[in-house]
């Protein structure tokens, strides 16, 4: 089916399957003008969009941090304003991932850690997206992951095919970091769980346009099955739709939540 062709790898079980994991479904970003009439009422001020979003979903992936990392005070503000039970994942800055390609990460690791403290109980996962021209470098990835405190949950999204290797999975497992499961636009879909949690990014089913198209009901049922399996194995799952065009991400996230038996407050 569209959006989930790839390789199904199984990995060691790091979790207690005697209890189910928690599932959070949301979108990548929230401040889109073209979501008016889909998620936001017409004329809703931009400053009110996150609160409106958080009344309907329990997680979001912050993408603006990739382009400009927020101040620690901004993270503290989100901690105060977001409702109880809400969790925000944050995309690592491109200066670290694309500019330096994880080289000499100490300054960024300290800054991220300080902001993670400020986000407090609203923090979810740090997404580290590596660029497509960054080929496999185990030593550099190992050094970067070791530079972060172990209590920060990290997921790594690889775009170069050389990273698809058992040695890389073992490295992630040693650090408790999650291999980012991807869907869409020719990206490899590897169903590999390397941490006590699973991180999924759904970039859209259009084979030619990244972030394009809307997942079919069959696609979403397939993903509900995979997420249900991870949940039954005791793994927490964070899944974010990145096909924001036309509000497809909102609709797909709501449908997937319903398929997983998650109540919808709207």
Predicted regions and their residues:
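Residues lining hydrophobic/aromatic ligand-binding pockets adjacent to catalytic sites
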Residues: 1-266
């Amino acid at each position: 089916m569209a959006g989930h062709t790839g390789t199904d790898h199984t990995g060691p079980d790091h979790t207690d399957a005697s209890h189910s994991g928690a599932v959070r479904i949301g979108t990548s970003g929230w401040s889109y003008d073209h979501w008016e009439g889909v998620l936001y009422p017409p004329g809703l001020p931009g400053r009110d969009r996150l609160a409106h979003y958080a009344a309907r979903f329990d997680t979001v992936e912050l993408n603006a941090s990739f382009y400009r990392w927020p101040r620690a005070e901004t993270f503290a503000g989100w901690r105060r304003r977001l409702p109880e039970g809400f969790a925000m994942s944050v995309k690592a800055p491109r200066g670290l991932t694309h500019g330096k390609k994880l080289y000499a990460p100490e300054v960024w690791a300290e800054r991220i850690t300080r902001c993670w403290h400020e986000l407090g109980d609203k923090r979810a996962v740090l997404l580290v997206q590596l660029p497509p021209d960054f080929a496999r470098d185990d030593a550099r990835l190992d050094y970067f992951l070791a530079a972060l405190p172990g209590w920060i949950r990290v997921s790594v999204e690889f775009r170069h095919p050389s990273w698809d290797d058992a040695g890389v999975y073992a490295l992630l497992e040693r650090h408790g970091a999650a291999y980012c499961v991807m869907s869409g636009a020719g990206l490899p879909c590897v169903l590999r769980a390397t941490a006590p949690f699973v991180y999924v990014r759904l970039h859209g089913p259009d084979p030619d346009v990244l972030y394009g198209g809307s997942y079919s009901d069959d696609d979403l049922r397939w993903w509900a099955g995979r997420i249900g399996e991870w949940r039954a194995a005791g793994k927490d799952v964070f899944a974010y739709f990145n096909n924001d065009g036309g509000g497809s991400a909102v609709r797909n996230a709501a449908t997937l939540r319903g398929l997983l038996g998650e109540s919808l407050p709207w």
